[in-house]
Amino acid sequence: MPPDIEAIAEQVFIALADPTRRSILAALASGGPATATDLADRLPITRQAIAKHLFLLAEVGLVTAEPGERRRVRYRLRSAPMQVAQQFLAALARDWDTRLDALQVHLGR
């Protein structure tokens, strides 16, 4: 597996390990682009905490910040990093399937 895929997948998994960030991503997925204030209205989290998490999600590439009206920044989901993480997991699954198939052959099943 190319090292860049592993590095991107690692960053995505680190970001997804936090339940607050998963909630933010779920809110963006269901409600579309939103500001930190919009997300604070929907989630039981302060706007400041949401802004901190959005900054990390943007660094990883899971969200993108778009300038909006009156200097308000709207955040939108990006699927590319998730697709890389899915590729990483699919490669692991293929490796395990190959090993399990070999074990079944070895055991005579």
Residue ranges and their predicted role:
Residues 1-8, 30, 83-109:
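Amphipathic alpha-helical dimerization/coiled-coil segments
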Residues 2, 7-46, 69-83:
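N-terminal helix-turn-helix DNA-binding core of bacterial DNA-binding proteins
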Residues 14, 26, 58, 64, ...:
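A cross-family signal for key residues in well-ordered alpha-helices
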Residues 19, 59-61, 81, 94, ...:
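A generic structural signal for solvent-exposed, polar alpha-helical segments
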Residues 20, 32, 58-61, 107:
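Short amphipathic alpha-helical segments enriched in hydrophobics
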Residues 54-55:
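Short, hydrophobic-biased segments on the C-terminal half of alpha helices
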Residues 58-69, 76:
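Beta-hairpin "wing" of winged helix-turn-helix
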